[in-house]
Amino acid sequence: TCISYGGSQSIVEPKNASQVVLDLLEDIGVDLKRFTTAYDIGFFKRHGMGGVTYFNEEIFGEDKLVQHPYCNYPNYVEGLLGGRLSHEEAAAQAPLSKKGRKQLLRVLNGGLHALDVQEADLQDYINSHSYFDYLQKTLGVDDPGVLRMARHSGLDWGSFSAELMSIAQAKSCGAMGFPPKAVYDEDNPYIYHFPDGNAGVARALVKKLISGVAEGRNAEALVLARFNYAELDRPGNPVRLRLNSTVVNVKHGGDPASASEALVTYINDNKSFQVRGRNVVMACYNMMIPHLVSDLPEKQAAALRSQTKSPFVYTTVGLRNWHAMKDSGIGVAMSPGNMHQAVLMDFPVSMGGYKFTESPDKPCVIQM
């Protein structure tokens, strides 16, 4: 059995979370200390797998794998080996023109020290000047292959291309030309990952609210537990979850300043229903709230509308074995020019009776 995630990936920086969040996680049975042993930090080292780059023939003239990521993106995967090549070797192996390879090395050896800016003005400068201006004007980069590599090096760190990043943002995410660094501090390694991602948290929440839905005393025990969906909406439950029911309108039952109840309208099986509640928590994508709650204060509605999400596509692929990944040394492969811009092994987490793949002869899950 292979388990992976299809939505929210991991619990990010829990040690910086508020006490309310930490208390909630403890209350639903999430043991944060358990992840220090559940996550196999030595997996990638044992199998010689690190950050690499795959260049395709369509864009770069040849299909080529280079043992260097050219950016910091893969560094968020805990335990992943770094690039095997020096900057000089990596630039020499890139399928670029002679001029392009020279410019690539200039970028890889660049950084804030390349800016002719006084120390006192540096922070203002890097926050107000663009990363691509730095590449093109400060470093003199005009090779299209190098610029394409830079454009993809920021990947999913913002809701915009690296072309629109400030120098400060590019430095923060480790875009091409800024030295690899720890994306998360040592107190917050990126290891807080259930095999099914944060669905593990959601399942633990449901179990806390509706005890009869599954067997298991804590979140780890629920990893392989089967949920009895018939328990979710029983009339006798203190809490009932109704699936396939889309809320289309929420409003106060009267003047918002004095109303004692809220009215919720939802659609189920193409029929409209309305329920009343003393309180309603809008636990959804916040930008949708102004469209659902008609009597919000305008200032609050405007603030909620200002939020953005970036188009973001993950593809999960099951493989019969992962010899190709191991033999090529691929833990994470950056792929500038491909529709999928990165390919990576799933996180090596074993818990709750679930065992992550250990042998390349066995099936595995990769993310793209």
Question: What residue ranges belong to the model's regions?
Answer:
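Short, solvent-exposed loop/turn and secondary-structure capping segments
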Residues: 22-24, 65, 148-149, 162-164, ...
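Conserved beta-strand->loop/alpha-helix structural units within folded catalytic cores of enzymes
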Residues: 17-18, 33-36, 128-131, 138-140, ...
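A generic secondary-structure signal for well-formed alpha-helical elements
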Residues: 25-33, 112, 138-143, 209-216, ...
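C-terminal segments that line or cap access tunnels to active or ligand-binding sites in enzymes
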Residues: 186-193, 251, 260-279, 284-368
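Residues that flank catalytic or metal-binding motifs in active/ligand-binding sites
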Residues: 7, 48-49, 237, 243-246, ...
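N-terminal glycine-rich phosphate/pyrophosphate-binding loop and immediately adjacent elements
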Residues: 1-113, 119-120
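Active-site/ligand-binding neighborhood in enzyme catalytic cores
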Residues: 95-245, 253-260
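Active-site rim elements
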Residues: 4-15, 117-124, 187-196, 300-308
